[in-house]
Amino acid sequence: MNEQSMKPYVIGLDLGGTNSVFGIV
């Protein structure tokens, strides 16, 4: 989950739905 802190927008786009909200934030 360290990557989410460094680049949450990438994680959100990666899932393309589940973490879309986190990606925007």
UniProtKB/Swiss-Prot annotation:
Keyword Nucleotide-binding among record annotations: yes
According to the UniProt entry, its GO molecular function terms are: ATP binding; glucokinase activity; mannokinase activity
**UniProt superkingdom:** Bacteria
EC id = 2.7.1.2, 2.7.1.7
| Enzyme class, UniProt record, top EC level | transferase
Q: What does this protein do?
A: The enzyme has great affinity for glucose and mannose.
Family membership: Belongs to the ROK (NagC/XylR) family.
Q: How does it assemble?
A: Homodimer.
**What is the recorded name of this protein?**
Glucomannokinase
